[in-house]
Amino acid sequence: MELTTPERVLFETEVYEIDDDLKVKRGNVKITESRIMFRSNGNAKLLYISGIQMVEIKKENRWGFFAGGLIFLVSSAIMYLLGLEFGVGSFTSALMLFVLPTAFLFVSLLLLYWWFVTRSYLLDMHTNFGRKLRIRSKSKEDLYEIANAVELVKMGAVRMLQRKERQFV
């Protein structure tokens, strides 16, 4: 069944949402004259704009992945240097001085790649009842447009614009 909006849609974009249980869902955000609708596979959320207390945009850099990748990279470099210094005399020394640093190098590259891929911007909308809706996007402009549309609706500027349009027609 399709969720319909009887109101005019002011803004629509594709973003990510993060639930309280930390599940990430790709979906569609529509902002109408009185509410925000987030649709994704299997669920839809409606949030009335009058219930939003605060809107916050922040950059989520995921520094943990970056730090972990650098630690593994430095560790593998140290192990490679130790392998060159002491040489390979047995199977266990080959394992410790070549195979393990190579594994560390691959893990570090994967962590650095994951850090690069998952950096994004977050839009937090805090509601009356202490709940929070998080929307994630790679594009900061989409989140600014959502925040601006929410503020325009909260101020009543959209309804004032509609009244002015009706007066001139």
Curated annotation (Swiss-Prot):
Sequence intervals crossing the membrane: 62-84, 94-116
Gene Ontology cellular component list: plasma membrane
Membrane topology, as annotated: Multi-pass membrane protein
Keywords attached to this entry: Cell membrane, Membrane, Transmembrane, Transmembrane helix
Location(s), subcellular: Cell membrane
Source domain of life: Archaea
Keyword Membrane: yes
Protein name per UniProt: Uncharacterized protein AF_1266
UniProt source species: Archaeoglobus fulgidus (strain ATCC 49558 / DSM 4304 / JCM 9628 / NBRC 100126 / VC-16)
